[in-house]
């Protein structure tokens, strides 16, 4: 991240967008910590130059991305006739690839530097995801096996923390904007007419959708496709 920030300043890049994740909020493993540090370096970089606007976007799980849970579950169903989950109470945020791209463009078009853009995205029980995929790809013998949560895993993820909520705004129906908690040489008067968020945290435990909604999201993303014989 530091190398990219330095290169952006050296070559006068107009807009720098750090793509982050919910793992950056109260991180519990090295991956989350590096994402959190990357966010902080990006926001702080706004004080190093006036030529580049440094912005973050923070999202949940992009459906179908490399190593994501959906193709992993589908492969388990097809090869082992089961799905393994760590905890039936676990929830996660999900968005499609097209929604992730929209988040990038939203940040690029509407940021002035220092903000973190968060999509108002749905969340689901991982067990419900397994059920929907089993219903589509499995059979009456396909099982869900609960193997126990790993020490670094969270039951629920958070996109906006309690520390960040006092400086967070509802940008529109689809996006929230977190303003920096450090002093940045930027003006945010364009948010004066926007409502501050009223919740303490934006957690995957609080925005849960049902299996029908998840089915439609998976269809929209092109993940429920019957194979031709």
Model-derived features with residue positions:
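N-terminal Rossmann-like NAD(P)+-binding domain of SDR-like oxidoreductases, especially those catalyzing
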Residues: 1-52, 56, 228-229
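Strand-loop microenvironment adjacent to phosphate/nucleotide-handling motifs in alpha/beta enzyme folds
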Residues: 10, 40-61, 66-229
